[in-house]
C-alpha cells in the first residue's frame, strides 16, 4: 500500500503551463513524467523542480484547462518516452509520441526517453564531404557538410520555411536514408502542406487502398506547433531528435533532421522559465539559454555508427543577429545561411546574403581549388560593389572609373544569377524549379567573373539555372525587343 501512496500525488496549484504536485512519500526524480486525467484525456507533466514541502513543480505537455486542485497524479517512474524505429515512418506524432494523423496507434516495438546524453568525444566522426543541395548560392558560397549542422537565419517572412522545404525537396526525396522533421512552434498549415507534399512525392508511401503506410516511407514527422502550450514546444525538438538518434545508432543510417524553428524552442523555454520562478537574463531570456541549446545541439552529431545531417531554421527577432537566441546557436553550426530582407526586397530569391553566410567546409581541401577561388572572387566582386554603393547613391554611376563600372556591372549580374526558381514555389511563380549541379554552378560563376558574359543583359541572369539558360534567356529577350 505504501508504494501506491508514494507514487500518487495531488495537484496543489496550477499556474498556466506550470503545475505543482504534492507527494506524501518519495518525490519523483527531475525530468520524470507524471500522468493525470484531464476530462478523459491523458495529460503528461514533466518534473522540473523540487520545491521542498514534498512538492514538485512540473511543466505540462498539453493544455491545463480543466485541471483542479487535489486531483490525483501518477508518477510513471520514467522520463517521457516516444516510439522509435521503422513504425514511426510515415506517421505524424506529437511531443509525447501520440499519433495525431488519425490513423490509429503507432505500434512501435520500442520507445526511448527524450533526454539522452550526447555521444562521447571518442565516438564523434569528423569526415568532411559536401552535401549537394542544387541551390547555386548555397553550393557555391556556403556549402553544407554531410553529417554537419546547418542553420538558416532570417527575420519574419524572408523565406526560411520555403528554403527548408526546397532543401527537403532536393535532398530528402533523393536521399536513400531516413528523414525526421520536427515542427517546433510554427504554423500548423505549413505542417499540413508538408505532409501532403510528402504523400504526393512518395516520400510517405501508400498501400493498395491509397492510405499512407510506414512500409516504404522515408520520413517521420513530429509536430508541436504554435497553438501548443510552451511545455510541448520546448520538448518537441527533443522528441524528434530521439527518433533520429535511433536510426543513427541502432540502424547505422545517415539521417536528415529538419527543425523548423529552433528559435521557438528557445522562446518556449523562456515562457516556462519565468513561470518556474527563474530570474530572467539578457532580453528576458531564460538564464539557462546556453545550457538548453547546448544539450540539444550536442546530441545532433555524427558518430562512427551513422550520421545526422541537420537543417535548422532559426528566426531572427527584429532582424537582429546579435539577439541572444540566434547568437547562441551560431557557435554550434558548421554552416550558416543568412537570409537578408534587403535582398528579398530586390525580388532576389532565395534571399541569401552571399557576404554574411559562412561554411566550415569552404576550403580548397574539401571543395577543390577552382571552387574555392571562384567563390572568393564572387564574394570579392560583391564586396567591392557594396563599398561603391554609397558613392553611386550620392554621385551616380558616371563618376566611377571604368574598372569600377565593370565591377558594378558584373556584381549586379552575379547578384541576379544567385537567384533561382524553386520547385516548391512553382505553384506561386509559374516558373519551373531548377536543380543545378555543383560543377555547373562553379563553371557558370567562373565564366561570369572572368567577364565571358559581360555582353549579356542583367535581366538574362535573373531566375535561371545554369549559364546556358542565361544565354538562352538573353536570346529570347533580344528577339522580343
Swiss-Prot record:
It is an enzyme of class 7 (translocase). Produces ATP from ADP in the presence of a proton gradient across the membrane. The catalytic sites are hosted primarily by the beta subunits. Its EC number is 7.1.2.2. It is a peripheral membrane protein. ATP binds at residues 154-161. PROSITE patterns: ATPASE_ALPHA_BETA. GO terms for molecular function: ATP binding; ATP hydrolysis activity; proton-transporting ATP synthase activity, rotational mechanism. Keywords: ATP synthesis, ATP-binding, Cell inner membrane, Cell membrane, CF(1), Hydrogen ion transport, Ion transport, Membrane, Nucleotide-binding, Translocase, Transport. F-type ATPases have 2 components, CF(1) - the catalytic core - and CF(0) - the membrane proton channel. CF(1) has five subunits: alpha(3), beta(3), gamma(1), delta(1), epsilon(1). CF(0) has three main subunits: a(1), b(2) and c(9-12). The alpha and beta chains form an alternating ring which encloses part of the gamma chain. CF(1) is attached to CF(0) by a central stalk formed by the gamma and epsilon chains, while a peripheral stalk is formed by the delta and b chains. InterPro entries: AAA+_ATPase, ATP-synt_VA_C, ATP_synth_F1_bsu, ATPase_a/bsu_AS, ATPase_alpha/beta_chains, ATPase_F1/V1/A1_a/bsu_N, ATPase_F1/V1/A1_a/bsu_N_sf, ATPase_F1/V1/A1_a/bsu_nucl-bd. The keyword RNA-binding does not apply. This is ATP synthase subunit beta. It is found in: Cell inner membrane. GO terms for cellular component: plasma membrane; proton-transporting ATP synthase complex. The keyword Transport applies. Belongs to the ATPase alpha/beta chains family. The lineage of its organism: Bacteria, Pseudomonadati, Pseudomonadota, Alphaproteobacteria, Sphingomonadales. It holds the Pfam family ATP-synt_VA_C. The gene is atpD. It catalyses: ATP + H2O + 4 H(+)(in) = ADP + phosphate + 5 H(+)(out).
Amino acid at each position: 500500500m505504501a508504494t501506491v501512496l508514494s507514487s500518487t500525488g495531488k495537484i496543489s496549484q496550477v499556474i498556466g503551463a506550470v503545475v505543482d504536485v504534492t507527494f506524501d512519500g518519495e518525490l519523483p526524480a527531475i525530468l520524470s513524467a507524471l500522468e493525470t486525467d484531464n476530462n478523459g484525456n491523458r495529460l503528461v507533466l514533466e518534473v522540473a523542480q523540487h520545491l521542498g514541502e514534498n512538492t514538485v513543480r512540473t511543466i505540462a505537455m498539453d493544455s491545463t484547462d480543466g485541471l483542479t486542485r487535489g486531483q490525483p497524479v501518477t508518477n510513471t517512474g520514467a522520463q517521457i518516452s516516444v516510439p522509435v524505429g521503422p513504425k514511426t515512418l510515415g506517421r505524424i506524432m506529437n511531443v509525447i509520441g501520440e499519433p495525431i494523423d488519425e490513423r490509429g496507434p503507432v505500434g512501435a516495438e520500442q520507445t526511448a526517453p527524450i533526454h539522452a546524453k550526447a555521444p562521447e568525444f571518442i565516438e564523434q566522426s569528423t569526415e568532411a564531404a559536401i552535401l549537394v543541395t542544387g541551390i547555386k548560392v548555397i553550393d557555391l558560397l556556403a556549402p553544407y557538410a554531410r553529417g554537419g549542422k546547418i542553420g538558416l537565419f532570417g527575420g519574419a517572412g524572408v523565406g526560411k520555411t520555403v528554403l527548408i522545404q526546397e532543401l527537403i525537396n532536393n535532398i530528402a526525396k533523393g536521399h536513400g536514408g531516413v528523414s525526421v522533421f520536427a515542427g517546433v512552434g510554427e504554423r500548423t498549415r505549413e505542417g499540413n502542406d508538408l505532409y501532403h507534399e510528402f504523400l504526393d512525392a512518395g516520400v510517405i508511401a501508400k498501400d493498395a487502398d491509397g492510405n499512407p503506410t510506414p512500409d516504404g516511407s522515408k520520413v517521420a514527422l513530429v509536430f508541436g506547433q504554435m497553438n501548443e502550450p510552451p511545455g510541448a514546444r520546448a520538448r518537441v525538438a527533443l522528441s524528434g531528435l530521439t527518433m533520429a538518434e535511433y536510426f543513427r545508432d541502432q540502424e547505422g543510417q545517415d539521417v536528415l533532421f529538419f527543425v523548423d524553428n529552433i528559435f521557438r524552442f528557445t522562446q518556449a523555454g523562456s515562457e516556462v522559465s519565468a513561470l518556474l520562478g527563474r530570474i530572467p537574463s539578457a532580453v528576458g531570456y531564460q538564464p539557462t539559454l546556453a545550457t538548453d541549446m547546448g544539450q540539444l545541439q550536442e546530441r545532433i552529431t555524427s558518430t562512427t555508427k551513422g550520421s545526422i545531417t541537420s537543417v535548422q531554421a532559426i528566426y531572427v527577432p527584429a532582424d537582429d543577429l546579435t539577439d541572444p537566441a540566434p547568437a547562441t546557436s551560431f557557435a554550434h553550426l558548421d554552416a550558416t545561411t543568412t537570409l537578408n530582407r534587403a535582398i528579398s526586397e530586390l525580388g532576389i530569391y532565395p534571399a541569401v546574403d552571399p557576404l554574411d553566410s559562412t561554411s566550415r567546409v569552404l576550403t580548397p581541401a574539401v571543395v577543390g581549388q577552382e571552387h574555392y577561388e571562384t567563390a572568393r572572387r564572387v564574394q570579392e566582386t560583391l564586396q567591392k560593389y557594396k563599398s561603391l554603393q554609397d558613392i553611386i547613391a550620392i554621385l551616380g554611376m558616371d563618376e566611377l572609373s571604368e574598372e569600377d563600372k565593370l565591377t558594378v556591372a558584373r556584381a549586379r549580374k552575379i547578384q541576379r544569377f544567385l537567384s533561382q526558381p524553386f520547385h516548391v514555389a512553382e505553384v506561386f511563380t509559374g516558373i519551373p524549379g531548377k536543380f543545378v549541379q555543383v560543377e555547373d554552378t562553379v563553371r557558370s560563376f567562373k565564366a561570369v567573373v572572368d567577364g565571358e558574359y559581360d555582353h549579356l543583359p542583367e535581366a538574362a541572369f535573373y531566375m535561371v539555372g545554369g549559364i546556358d539558360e542565361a544565354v538562352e534567356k538573353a536570346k529570347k529577350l533580344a528577339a522580343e525587343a
